[in-house]
Every structure is written in C-alpha cells, then in structure tokens.
Design a protein with these regions (language model features):
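Extracytosolic helix-loop segments that constitute the early lumenal/periplasmic catalytic or substrate-binding loops
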Residues: 2-4, 8, 13-46, 50-53, ...
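Transmembrane-helix signature of polytopic, membrane-embedded enzymes
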Residues: 68, 77-100, 133-135
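Transmembrane helical bundles and short interhelical boundary loops of multi-pass, membrane-embedded
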Residues: 159, 165-166, 171, 176-185, ...
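Transmembrane-helix motifs of polytopic, lipid-linked glycan transferases
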Residues: 60, 64-85, 123, 290-294
Length: 405
C-alpha cells in the first residue's frame, strides 16, 4: 500500500538502487566511466533491478522486490512453524506475528539487501530441515549472493550435519557422507555464489576486473578488498548501535525524517523508523531466553527439541557473530535476520501455554490477549513504519525513549 512513499531515496536506498540501475545499463556498477567499488555481492541489487525493469525507475519499482520477499517471508515462516509444531493455530499465530512486526514492514518497503538475505537464509534452513540438501545448498548460495553474513548460518548447518554423520552413520559410510556435505554445502553454494557475479565476469568495467588476466584471480583480488572494507568499517554514525541493544530496540535506525506542513497543526512530522514493534520484540526477548533455557535442558536430558534448536541456530549464527566486531559500525536494522527466530520463540512459548495445566479458556485468553496487545502496539506505531504525516506532538508521543530520536 502506497509503496512509492516517501518519495526519493531513503537511507541506503541511494547505493542499492543506483547499483541496480547500473546493472540494467552496464551489467556492473560504475561511477561515470570508472569502475565503482561495491562492498556487497550483486544478487540483491539484481532483484531490485528486476522491479525497476518491470515497473520503471521510480519508488514503486525500487521497492517492489523487497515487498514481494517480505510477503514470501511471512509464508515461509508459517510453513516452517507448521513443520515444527503441526498446529494450524500456531501456524496462523506465527504468520500474524510476522505481519505485525514493524521492522519487517519497514524492510519490506525499503530497497535494501537484508530482507533478501533473510529470506534465502531461512529458505536454506527450511530445506535443510526437510532433507532437501541440494536445494538447501542452492538457497544458501543465493543468500551469500545477497550478503556475506549468510556464511555464519551455512557454517552452523555444516557443523550440525557433520556431527550427525559422525555419531549416527557406519564408519564405512562416513567418507562418502562427508563428501556429499562438502559438495552440497561447499561446492554448490560457492558455484551459485560465483554465478551471481556473471555481470562482472561478462564486463570489462567492473572493479578489479583488469587486476589479472585470470578473471577468477581478479575476483579474488576484489573479495580481498571487500573483506578489508568490512573488517575496517569503523566510521561513526549517529544511528549506529551495539548488538546488545538490538533485541530490545534500544537504538532504532531512522531511515527518513521530514517536517512538512499539511497535518492540520503548526508542527508536523514524517518519519520512517526501522524499529520492531516494541511489545513484540520485548516479549520475544523474554521468550528467547526461555527457549534457550529449554534447549539447555534438552541437552542435559539428551532429548531432541527441534523448535528450540531452530531458535538457537538463529541466535548463534545471526546474532552472536556481531559481538566479535565491537568497533565495527553496526545498526539495529541488521536484526531483521533474527526476527523470524524471535517469532518462533514466541510461538514456542504460546504452545507451552496452550498445553499447560491451566484452564484451557484462561491459557487461550492469555495467548490471544498477548497477540491483541502486540497488534494494538503495531497500529500505534504504524505511522512511523510507513512514513505517514502526523503532528509533531503525535510523533513525540511515540518516542518512548530519548534513544529513539
């Protein structure tokens, strides 16, 4: 709805839309007649370019792809929750919680790369859990083609798969099984990832393309520069935030702010604030701690809790790695990769509540009441998720903490 608003670029759309436009025109990103250094793989920008090719070089075209993938992500999580719990009620609850999260809504309305990363990563995990290993490897290759941070999820999946092979298979079968893992989760993702660079291979204008007569060596040279950039990214930004505050939305990222007229008041405001629906994330944070407790308990009792395993995978691969880079410039909107796992944690707790010894009507009322509370919170913050024009007082009332300004 009204995907073309706000007009013009918001936040980092400038970089990714510009890259998508270059892909359509040249196959690579350039600045004038010169190659342009870009710090992320090309697939996400190719997806943005697809929207531009279909709907034109305008705000709707820029954001169409992320809107589609945001919708698909809701369906994917609903499917995953169905597989985990086999409950229509919990499946609907998961879809509902995804749909009323402000961070997902903002990402779905902004031409950034993180939503593509999140979708393909979750798709890879889902396919892996269903033993569709070739397709899972393909999905992880696509995730890497959007952002490198998918590598943490791929690494966790590989480690878990190898562990299962070592403890459950005949020693004579182990070498063959390990070779399959290397092929499916090593060579295949690497091949898919490399194919996302086809525009760079077929052009002589890409960054570092002329650094070697061997295009593979040239691409490796380019990747060394990308790695150096990410490791050394310490430039200060007014909205940067430490990962410790991400789950509770301590310092959300303002994507857009304007103070136009036309709200019927002397002072007006429009903002797109990349913040998760507060009650959803605060409740979800508590749920995550509880799920981790249940996961540790399952380890001690040597039982399998697939839903808890899923949440822990998300924390270990999507959250903890950021703590290893304390000086790097980071933002709360990166937490979109954690959001599906947070939703599953809430659904996990809802399942336990519904199966508890409490009166069924009481337990159902608690679950429904929590969802209604989150939904009301979502509606209250909706103007900040979509950049609607409101009075300055209305905007100020939604700044519950000074760190949100």
């Amino acid at each position: 709805f009204n995907l073309g608003s706000p007009k013009g670029f918001i936040f980092d759309e400038l970089y990714y839309v510009d890259g998508a436009q270059d892909f359509l025109n040249f196959g690579v990103e350039v600045t004038g007649a010169n190659p342009e250094f870009i710090a992320h793989p090309p697939l996400g920008k190719w997806l943005i370019a697809a929207g531009i090719a279909i709907f034109g070089d305008n705000e709707f075209g820029w954001r169409f792809a992320t809107a589609v993938f945001g919708t698909l992500l809701i369906l994917l999580i609903a499917r995953l929750v169905h597989v985990l719990f086999y409950s229509p009620v919990l499946t609907a609850l998961a879809a509902g919680l995804m749909a009323v999260d402000g961070l997902l809504l903002v990402h779905s309305r902004t031409a950034l790369l993180d939503l593509f990363l999140t979708f393909f990563t979750l798709l890879g995990i889902y396919l892996w859990s269903r033993n569709r290993h070739w397709w899972a490897g393909f999905a992880f290759g696509l995730a890497l083609g959007c952002k490198w941070s998918a590598i943490y999820f791929l690494a966790i999946i590989v480690l878990i798969t190898l562990y299962r092979i070592l403890v459950t298979h005949d020693i004579r079968e182990t070498p063959r099984k390990i070779a399959l893992v290397v092929t499916r989760y090593g060579l295949l993702p690497l091949t898919v990832y490399t194919l996302t660079w086809l525009g760079w291979f077929f052009s002589d204008r890409g960054w570092d393309r002329q650094s070697s007569s061997n295009p593979i060596i040239a691409l490796i040279n380019y990747h060394e520069e990308i790695l150096s950039f990410h490791v050394g990214l310490t430039e200060k930004h007014p909205y940067q935030s430490h990962p410790l505050g991400w789950l509770v939305m301590l310092r959300p990222t303002s994507f857009f702010y304007d103070a136009p007229s036309g709200c019927g008041n002397a002072e007006c405001a429009r903002e797109v604030l990349a913040i998760g629906t507060p009650f959803l994330w605060w409740i979800g944070t508590i749920a995550i701690f509880f799920v981790v407790y249940r996961w540790i308990k399952s380890l001690r009792s040597r039982t399998t809790d697939n839903a808890a395993n899923f949440v822990v995978i998300g924390l270990v691969a999507g959250y903890l790695p950021w703590f290893a880079l304390p000086d790097r410039t980071m933002f709360t909107f990166y937490a979109i990769i954690i959001q599906p796992f947070l939703v599953v944690a809430i659904v996990y707790c809802a399942k336990l509540m519904l199966e508890s010894r409490l009166n069924p009507l009481l337990s159902q009322s608690i679950v429904v009441g929590v969802f209604i509370l989150i939904f009301i919170c979502f509606l209250y913050f909706l103007p900040l998720f979509t950049g609607q024009l409101i009075t300055y007082d209305q905007w100020q009332n939604r700044m519950w903490f000074s760190s949100w300004i």
